[in-house]
Amino acid sequence: MAEGGFEDRELEEIRRRKLEELQKRAELERQAQIAAAQRRVALKRILTPEALARLDNIRVVRPELAEALEQQLIALASSGRVKVPIDDETLKKILEAIYSQTRREYRFRL
């Protein structure tokens, strides 16, 4: 009988740890959703509808680029280094600048 009590306690401990893990994961997901919603509100304030649509298109194709671009746009706007609202042409120029900084050139010698 003593062995059965030990197994019950062990199972209860496993359940408790699993529940804590699920709760932590749910909380992290909730925080991520809140942060994404706050970014979206900020982007709606600093981008024209056309520029926001372009950013949404980028997000579909390259989500990691869109996230980096969002952070950069919010930083540029909050520091006053770019005129708000950012229109589609300005967004294109920012994208070109990012692309030229991150693009690697490969040269082959024959």
Swiss-Prot record:
UniProt cross-references to Pfam families, sorted A to Z: dsDNA_bind
Domain of life: Archaea
Single GO MF descriptor: DNA binding
Keywords per UniProt: DNA-binding
InterPro entries xrefs: DNA_bind_arc, PDCD5-like, PDCD5-like_sf
GO cellular component, one term: cytosol
Transmembrane segments: none
Family in the record: Belongs to the PDCD5 family.
Protein name, entry field: DNA-binding protein Pisl_0441
Source organism of this protein record: Pyrobaculum islandicum (strain DSM 4184 / JCM 9189 / GEO3)
